[in-house]
Swiss-Prot record:
Peptide chain release factor 1 directs the termination of translation in response to the peptide chain termination codons UAG and UAA. NCBIfam families: prfA, PRK00591.1. SMART domains: PCRF (SM00937). It comes from the Bacteria. Methylated by PrmC. Methylation increases the termination efficiency of RF1. Belongs to the prokaryotic/mitochondrial release factor family. It is found in: Cytoplasm. InterPro entries: PCRF (IPR005139), Pep_chain_release_fac_I (IPR000352), Pep_chain_release_fac_I_sf (IPR045853), Prokaryotic/Mito_RF (IPR050057), RF-1 (IPR004373). This is Peptide chain release factor 1. GO terms for cellular component: cytoplasm. Keywords: Cytoplasm, Methylation, Protein biosynthesis. The lineage of its organism: Bacteria, Bacillati, Bacillota, Clostridia, Eubacteriales. The modification N5-methylglutamine is found at residue 233.
Amino acid sequence: MLEKLDSLEEKYDELTHLLSQPEVLSDQARFQKLAKAHSALSDIVTMYREYKSLSRQLEDSKEMLVEEEDEEFRQMLADEIPQLQEKKASLEQELRILLLPQDPNDEKSVIMEIRAGTGGEEAALFAGDLFRMYSRYAEEQGWKIEIMDTHYTDIGGIKEIVFVVDGRGAYSKLKFESGVHRVQRIPVTESGGRIHTSAATVAVLPEAEEVEVAIDPNDLRIDVYCSSGPGGQSVNTTQSAVRITHVPTGEVVTCQDEKSQHKNKAKALRVLRARLKELLEEEKNAEMAGTRKNQVGSGDRSERIRTYNFPQGRVSDHRINLTLHRLESVLEGRLEEIINALIAHYQAERLKQVD
């Protein structure tokens, strides 16, 4: 591990030197490329330097403890050494995590899809709750939400919503949200006061760049129609809604939220590109499926990942046996505790495999 860290530190110093050279400063494309590489190494090199400094301090303290005759000073050193050892072990663990191969999609924006599952109108109302939860979380993170397509029910629930969460690192935090989310509560439509169980499915796709997924226009069938609102009534007399079918894969994307057919087509292609990227990555990772299953869920949309229990005011994530008794604040978008716990668990699983 130390050899690898020494090599990264050397590379970082080399990049620092290059970034100050006139020939690099005058070439914006090269400067940006080198600056990005420099920034990517910054955290791990800073931590490694702290680790080396701490290691030297620990060795010095051990030597002084052997040589020192003053009892009071010896006691101070004896108290300090375990603290330094604990901090060194903690930094070593953090460095091991930083050395793990990064998910190339982690820094990307995401396209999220929420669909009401079993439970009729109640499931659609819950899908709306999930969308509000993610919207508030995104707002807290400083990310932007852009709705691509929405289908409402008669009482204002959401049958299906597709939206972009635009912000650096969105995928690294939201990728663990893929799966089935279950709700247990007394529906507003229930007169008998009985608790019902409903579900909604969430899919999280890293946004794909045009250069990553080339789409042949000849592979597309594009249909246009009038957009509709709650209950199916027409809300637009012009044919602005767009349905794109990717014939080779059978993937279908609809978009009707914009008044312009051109804008709806552009949004639908954006979603289609992300779905095709996911299909390509699923094929590529097929051999690794067993490994992924042993980690924090598989990202499988059919996997039940979390339950929101209203009578008990709790949220339970079934992948890591985490239960929080603050349902209301979670639905207000305060997801950081759950997401951080999932990331930590995932990293620990990956470290086990490396070991």
